[in-house]
């Protein structure tokens, strides 16, 4: 699948993030949970899946026929980048044949000592046809990553780094700026409701990822519990 085909596939649709990390209720040492989430997403009309880890990606590929944005989350402390942070993770993801690989493209110090531009260059030299999505937190990072050779940028890390503004809703301002700059953008982060998804779509993004509002029942249930408990009893 090339860049144009992927963009056409996700246009006007929802990419569902199906992830669970150790310590979370839906995480299982034996696997088997995320492909069920992906199957439900496909039946609902999702156009693609975002998944973490080689195991989950392979299981999801067997369960659905949707393209996958693959990542591997691994800490390399004391550095803060943990989403597909080194070539080791890139190699492992390429071996799964996932359509897109997403990686941290912030300008923070990296574990491998490379700048993000050098890292992107090495990936493109090694895997020239592999589609890349840049997980970024602000416009400068997005602009830099796109000029360095990634295929799409994502607002995945907006609000989660020291270099971005903390907020409870999607970063509409950043999305608008990226669309205006004609940088292919996949909206991601804090899209909590269908109304917010509609607003994001109207901005003109190329695609959007929704995770917590769909595939994290702990967060969803907590939201309802807090709302009900905040109401004063008659």
From Swiss-Prot:
Pfam families to which the protein is assigned, alphabetical: NanE (PF04131)
User: Which keywords does this Swiss-Prot/TrEMBL entry list?
Assistant: Carbohydrate metabolism, Isomerase
- InterPro entries attached to this UniProt entry: Aldolase_TIM, NanE, RibuloseP-bd_barrel
Report the GO molecular function annotations. N-acylglucosamine-6-phosphate 2-epimerase activity
Query: Which GO BP terms apply?
Result: carbohydrate metabolic process; N-acetylmannosamine catabolic process; N-acetylneuraminate catabolic process
**Assigned protein family:** Belongs to the NanE family.
Function of the molecule:
Converts N-acetylmannosamine-6-phosphate (ManNAc-6-P) to N-acetylglucosamine-6-phosphate (GlcNAc-6-P).
Q: What protein does this entry describe?
A: Putative N-acetylmannosamine-6-phosphate 2-epimerase
């Amino acid at each position: 699948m090339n860049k144009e085909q992927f963009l056409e596939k996700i246009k006007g649709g929802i990419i569902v993030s199906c992830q669970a990390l150790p310590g979370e209720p839906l995480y299982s040492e034996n696997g088997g949970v995320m492909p069920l989430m992906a199957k439900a997403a496909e039946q609902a009309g999702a156009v693609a899946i975002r998944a973490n880890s080689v195991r989950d990606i392979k299981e999801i590929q067997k369960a659905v026929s949707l393209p996958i944005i693959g990542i591997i989350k691994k800490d390399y402390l004391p550095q803060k980048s943990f989403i597909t942070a080194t070539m080791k993770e890139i190699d492992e993801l390429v071996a799964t044949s996932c359509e897109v690989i997403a990686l941290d493209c912030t300008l923070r110090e990296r574990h491998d000592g490379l700048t993000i531009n050098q890292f992107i260059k090495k990936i493109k030299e090694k895997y020239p046809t592999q589609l890349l999505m840049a997980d970024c937190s602000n416009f400068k990072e997005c602009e830099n990553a796109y000029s360095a050779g990634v295929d799409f940028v994502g607002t995945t890390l907006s609000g989660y780094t020291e270099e971005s503004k903390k907020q409870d809703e999607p970063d509409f301002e950043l999305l608008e700026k990226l669309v205006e700059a004609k940088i292919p953008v996949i909206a991601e982060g804090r899209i909590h409701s269908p109304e917010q998804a509609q607003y994001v779509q109207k901005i003109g993004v190329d695609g959007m990822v929704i995770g917590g509002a769909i595939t994290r029942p702990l967060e969803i249930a907590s939201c309802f519990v807090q709302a009900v408990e905040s109401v004063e009893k008659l």
